[in-house]
Amino acid sequence: MDFINKNPALLLIDIQKAFLDKDYPGGKRNNHNAELICGKILEKWRELGLNVIHVRHSSTNPNSKLHESKPGFEFNDYVKPKGNEMILTKHVNSAFIGTGLDGILKSFNINTLVIVGMTTNHCISTSVRMAGNLGYETFLINDSTACYNTIGLDLSLIHISEPTRQAS
């Protein structure tokens, strides 16, 4: 855990009750222990007195399980914020868009992030890529994320099959 000496922050993304719902629209889920593992990581982080930032998703769709009026919007019991832990709310699939996160991290001289949460192929993936683009050293902890099967067309395959264009 060499990164502990680098003023890191634990970024807990979208660990909300909606993802416990068996009817959550997203297909079959993997890693049903992700929230428990995130809770254990959070406990250790708190013991060490390190920076903790909770990010939650607030859907703008009033019918979504992640809308602020629904029980699924609440934080999972394993990772409920305590004391002065920062809570940010986002409306898109990146923890950096519309939250002020980059400025907050810079104001605390944080340059290293450990990211855990939901879902691997959406908000985690996007936030990790943006963190890297913004210059943060970023870590993911094995088994600290989960995702759902892709339902319908896998759009990543479209990019692979696009013809290659070469300049002459």
Where are these regions (language model features)?
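Active-site acidic carboxylates
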Residues: 1-86, 103
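Glycine-centered short loops/turns at secondary-structure junctions
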Residues: 49-50, 109, 135
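Short, hinge-like loop/turn segments at secondary-structure boundaries
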Residues: 69-73, 132-133, 155-158
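Internal catalytic-core helix/loop-beta-alpha segment
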Residues: 84-121, 125
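A short glycine-rich beta-strand->turn/loop micro-motif centered on a GG-aromatic cluster
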Residues: 114-117, 137-151
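Short Gly/Thr/Asp-enriched flexible loops that form oxyanion-binding sites at enzyme active sites
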Residues: 124-134
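Single conserved hydrophobic/aromatic residue that forms the stacking wall/gate
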Residues: 158-168
